[in-house]
């Protein structure tokens, strides 16, 4: 149904008061990035290590019934960690995908150094979201990731994208320049989105 993929895209977007640019670290099937691009006011870019994944994403998105984006998603074939370190671009929202910590090289995407590099690529008032698939890690790995995250983002909050017993997904989210989260601000933001995004939010039960 794409409900979780839609949440992975839009929960970070609605927690920012006025996003104009969003960077997705990890492209996969393209569903999540396309869901973010439902709002024509948001320019979306996605980075994925494998160009073959980017090429095949359109096929997977079509079979999954992914929503047609309001504007094209810009894609970059690159290592996410190195891309963040080398780019000079800044973004209002940066979203990191569900990287399996046991896969070769993925561990470097959960380090204090990487989280700090991401923070340096946020626009003033920007937001970073790191999604975590809890079923893919043990408790010690989770504790290590959370400890590194809160060192860089002390005001972080955790949100559930999926409370499935089989595939639970939690997000670590922070706006470093924002001292505290205002629930009223998030609720107000959800009433101001584009009609297509509002429909997707309803479909994702947000």
What are these regions (language model features)?
Residues 1-23, 62, 78-88, 136, ...:
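Soluble small-group transferase modules, centered on the S-adenosyl donor enzyme superfamily
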Residues 101-110:
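Glycine/threonine-rich flexible loop motifs
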């Amino acid at each position: 149904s794409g409900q979780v993929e839609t949440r992975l895209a839009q929960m970070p977007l609605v927690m920012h008061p006025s996003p104009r640019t969003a960077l997705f670290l990890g492209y996969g099937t393209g569903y999540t990035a396309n869901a973010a691009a439902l709002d024509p006011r948001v320019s979306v870019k996605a980075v994925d290590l494998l160009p073959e994944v980017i090429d095949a994403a359109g096929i997977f998105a079509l079979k999954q019934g992914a929503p047609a984006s309001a504007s094209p998603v810009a894609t970059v074939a690159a290592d996410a960690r190195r891309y963040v370190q080398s780019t000079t671009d800044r973004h209002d929202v940066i979203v990191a995908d569900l990287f399996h910590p046991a896969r070769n090289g993925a561990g470097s995407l959960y380090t204090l150094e990487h989280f700090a590099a991401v923070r340096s690529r946020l626009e003033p008032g920007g937001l970073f979201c790191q999604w975590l698939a809890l079923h893919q890690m043990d408790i010690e790995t989770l504790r290590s990731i959370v400890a590194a995250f809160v060192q860089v983002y002390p005001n972080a909050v955790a949100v559930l994208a999926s409370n499935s017993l089989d595939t639970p997904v939690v997000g670590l989210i922070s706006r470093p320049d924002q001292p505290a989260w205002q629930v009223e601000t998030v609720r107000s933001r959800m009433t101001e989105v584009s009609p297509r995004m509002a429909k997707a939010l309803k479909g994702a039960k947000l």
